[in-house]
């Protein structure tokens, strides 16, 4: 063995022994309690006190009626859920500076405008998440830690009455997920730069849905003349009802769509994927393969002359059934 190799092995072994010694000292000195009580990513030994002091929370608050949405959030999740009654409500929790309200909202001319006030405590940095060590080094399991860490997420939740029609929904999220349950939008312009879109029982009659980095999952969706664009992420739609011409464009990601029976009977299809396969289960149409360009297509005419689903995927599989 070369002298250099022996030297490096000796140094490595010495560091291992030092690490084991420090671990033993920390363990016998009550280190497990520190790990249990501390956010390892911030190394905050004052348990939750500092985290709580740097957050602003608005409890569920009634707001006047409105017909349109104009939302711009750079670092927050957004939830739209069903109200327990005929009134609308808002609640949120956000990181903040100097305990000031980091979010502003107002209603003018029937439009609810919601935006960050410029004093959020959000910061942007490269983060290596070592918080999983809490489960290994203390009695706290992963599920408990996940529930606890969710207390520190930035979020805004709107509660809307069932069957409320939002005439216009203009929504932008920079870094955050968007969850919708039981919502109806007449015109939409929704854009997510980095986050997932998850909707359960959504109606969108016209407009645009744009996703840069994140998956889109729609359950019981009704779409009209909609343009959906996804740059990097998968698209999953279950029980899709079409009432117009819906166009979907994906750069990188797979598409899986399940149609309801009424849509299957009348809809036309124009499907194409450049690097992937097309599966059209139970649908009648013409399927082609251009081996030179590696392009798969599936086409069929609309039975009612107005309902059509067009999907163009640059790199990904398409499944429609």
Predicted regions mapped to residue ranges:
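A broad, low-specificity signal for short, low-complexity segments enriched in glycine/proline
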Residues: 32, 41, 49-53, 73-77, ...
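Short, surface-exposed interaction patches in beta-rich subdomains
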Residues: 200-201, 206-207, 216-321
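Generic detector of contiguous secondary-structure segments
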Residues: 95-110, 115, 257-273
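Right-handed parallel beta-helix
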Residues: 53-68, 77-85, 98-205, 210, ...
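Short, flexible beta-strand-to-coil junctions
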Residues: 72-75, 93-97
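Alpha-helical transmembrane segments and their membrane-interface anchoring/capping motifs
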Residues: 1-83, 133, 281, 321
